[in-house]
């Protein structure tokens, strides 16, 4: 593990000399997508042991890494557990950001983050200034893993007990928690059905909605809420995001309810 971390750190330092922040973010995502594509093409990634076409693997890896949610195959039925594991790892890395995870690994092994690397992190997190980016990066990982673990545990127990899925339900719970928190839009229910077969499952839907909302408001807002509990002390950005999210969520609910109320 230490060897891989050192290798990754040296590789990023080499790229630092020739790429600016935006180019660095784009390049690392391109490499993530390429690696994901190759893994999804392996016979062990599909349920029937066949190799996925490169164009389909590339599309799937791009969709998962960029948390888009578009599919060209039935995720629940086409992929094996290895393929589903590759997908959720791509979703997690894409949701957190490669530079964020690189920062975590560097800090974990005691490596110092220089100014240029801080600028890259600033670019990847869409921040206005480089100050505090290392602290925020570490908090990003902490927030994500904590929230995903809490809701993943709830969903795992729900799948295990209420839906009687056994041990498979535990894996499903954490898989869907990560997917929902990263706003990826992927699911394992199969038949391209998403949650339509569970529209009356209150626990499942409330957890998914909460994860989508919390993940959607962004890590900078979550960090601001943690440090400033009072509305007046929040940053303008946080106030705008929270207000807009509330208006769109509840306003959209009322509009859809009014338009679809008589629809059977």
Question: Model segments located where?
Answer:
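Membrane-proximal intracellular helices of multi-pass ion channels
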Residues: 1-264
């Amino acid at each position: 593990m230490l060897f891989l971390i050192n290798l990754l750190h040296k590789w990023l330092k080499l790229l630092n000399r020739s790429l600016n922040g935006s180019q660095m973010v784009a390049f690392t995502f391109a490499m993530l997508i390429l690696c994901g594509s190759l893994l999804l093409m392996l016979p062990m990634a599909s349920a029937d042991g066949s190799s996925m076409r490169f164009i389909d693997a590339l599309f799937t890896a791009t969709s998962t890494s960029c948390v888009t949610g578009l599919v060209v195959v039935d995720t629940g039925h086409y992929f094996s557990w290895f393929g589903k594991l590759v997908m959720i790892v791509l979703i997690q890395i894409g949701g957190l950001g490669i530079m964020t995870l690189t920062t975590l690994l560097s800090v974990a092994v005691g490596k110092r983050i220089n100014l240029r690397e801080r600028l890259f992190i600033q670019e990847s997190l869409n921040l206005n200034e480089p100050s505090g980016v290392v602290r925020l990066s570490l908090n990003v990982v902490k927030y994500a893993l904590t929230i995903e673990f809490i809701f993943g545990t709830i969903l795992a127990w729900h799948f295990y007990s209420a839906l009687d899925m056994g041990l498979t339900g535990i894996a499903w719970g954490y898989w869907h928690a990560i997917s929902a928190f990263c706003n990826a839009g992927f699911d394992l229910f199969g038949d391209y059905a998403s949650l339509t077969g569970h529209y009356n499952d209150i626990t499942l839907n409330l957890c998914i909605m909460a994860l989508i909302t919390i993940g959607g408001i962004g890590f900078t807002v979550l960090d601001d809420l943690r440090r400033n509990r009072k509305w007046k002390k929040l940053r303008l950005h946080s106030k705008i995001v929270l207000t807009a999210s509330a208006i769109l969520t509840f306003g959209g609910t009322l509009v859809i309810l009014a338009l679809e109320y008589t629809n059977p």
